[in-house]
C-alpha cells in the first residue's frame, strides 16, 4: 500500500499538472458518482491528507459550493498524468488495463494547453462539498507531512500523545493506526522499529519516547517524499541497500549479520484490522515474538 510520502508526491504531481485548469471532460467510473458533471469546474489544488488525495474544485458560476474529489490509492491505485505513471517504491508504473480506470479527467490551461489525469484502481472515489471533507478524513490523526508541522508544535505533541495513550498496545500496531498518526504504512512501520531498536510487538510503554519516534517518522517521510525509490539507510549501502529490514526475510541484518525474521501482527480487539506481515532483526530488536495471526473481517477505515 502506498505510504504517506508516495501519496504526497502523487498529489504534488497532480497539483502541478492541474491546478488552475478548467475541466473539459470528466468521467467518474464509480456508481455513486457516475452522473456527476464537472465540465467547466476549475481545479483549485490537489492536497494529501495522510494517505488520502483531495482534489478541490471551484464551480464555474456563483451559487454551487466548492467540491472535493476524494480518492484513496489503497493497495494498487495510481494516477497517470499525461500518460506517465507515478514511479515509486510502492506502485507499479507499468500499463494498466482500461477497465481499471476509475477517474478520467481532461483539463485546459489558460494558454490552451491540455492536461489529462487518469486514476487506475483507486478506491473510495467520492465527490463531496469541500466544507464536509472531515466526513472522510476527520478521523485521521496528525499528518506527518502536514505543511504546518514545523510551525505548529501541537501537531507533534498530539501525535506523541496519541501514541502514548495506550501504553500496553504493541508499538507496531499503534504506528500503523491512522487514527493515531497518519502517513505510516507497513514499510515505515518495520523500518522505524528497527531504527529505534524496538521489537514491533513490544508495548508502547517499553518502546522509548513517543515524541522521538514521531520526530524520526516525520524526518524519514520528508526525506523520501520527492524520491522515486524510498531509502531509510542513508543510501550508502549500494545495490539492494535502500531498506534495513522490510522485505528482507532470511537475509543478513546490515548491522549484526543475524538473519532478518518475518512475522505477523494483528489486533483482534479492533474490528477490521488484519494480520500484517512485518520484518525485524531478532538480535537488534530483542523482544516478544510475533506469532502468525489469522486475519479478521474488514471494517475500520485506514
Please give the residue ranges for each predicted region.
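Gly/Gly-Pro- and Ser/Thr-rich, intrinsically disordered tail segments characteristic of DNA damage-repair
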Residues: 1-126, 252, 300-302
Amino acid at each position: 500500500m502506498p505510504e504517506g510520502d508516495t501519496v504526497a508526491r502523487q498529489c504534488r504531481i497532480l497539483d502541478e499538472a492541474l491546478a488552475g485548469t478548467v475541466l473539459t471532460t470528466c468521467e467518474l467510473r464509480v456508481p455513486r458518482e457516475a452522473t456527476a458533471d464537472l465540465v467547466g469546474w476549475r481545479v483549485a489544488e490537489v492536497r494529501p491528507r495522510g494517505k488520502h488525495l483531495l482534489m478541490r474544485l471551484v464551480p464555474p458560476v456563483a451559487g454551487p459550493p466548492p467540491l472535493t474529489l476524494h480518492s484513496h490509492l489503497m493497495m494498487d491505485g495510481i494516477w497517470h498524468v499525461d500518460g506517465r505513471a507515478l514511479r515509486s517504491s510502492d506502485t507499479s508504473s507499468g500499463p494498466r488495463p482500461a477497465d481499471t480506470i476509475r477517474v478520467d479527467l481532461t483539463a485546459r490551461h489558460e494558454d490552451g494547453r491540455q492536461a489529462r489525469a487518469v486514476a487506475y484502481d483507486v478506491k473510495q472515489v467520492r465527490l463531496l462539498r469541500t466544507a464536509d471533507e472531515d466526513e472522510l478524513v476527520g478521523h485521521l490523526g496528525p499528518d506527518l507531512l502536514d505543511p504546518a508541522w514545523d510551525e505548529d508544535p501541537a501537531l507533534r505533541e498530539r501525535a506523541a500523545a496519541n501514541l502514548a495513550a495506550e501504553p500496553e498496545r504493541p508499538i507496531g500496531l499503534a504506528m500503523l493506526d491512522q487514527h493515531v498518526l497518519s502517513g505510516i504504512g507497513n514499510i515505515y512501520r518495520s523500518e522505524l522499529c528497527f531504527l529505534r531498536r524496538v521489537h514491533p510487538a513490544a508495548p508502547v510503554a517499553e518502546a522509548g519516547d513517543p515524541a522521538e519516534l514521531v520526530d524520526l517518522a516525520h524526518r524519514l517521510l520528508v526525506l523520501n517524499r520527492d524520491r522515486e525509490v524510498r531509502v531509510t539507510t542513508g543510501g550508502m549501502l549500494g545495490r539492494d541497500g535502500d531498506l534495513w529490514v522490510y522485505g528482507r526475510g532470511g537475509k543478513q541484518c546490515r548491522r549484526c549479520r543475524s538473519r532478518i525474521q518475518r512475522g505477523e501482527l494483528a489486533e483482534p480487539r479492533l474490528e477490521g484490522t488484519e494480520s500484517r506481515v512485518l520484518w525485524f532483526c531478532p538480535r537488534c530488536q530483542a523482544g516478544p515474538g510475533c506469532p502468525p495471526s489469522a486475519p479478521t473481517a474488514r471494517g475500520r477505515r485506514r
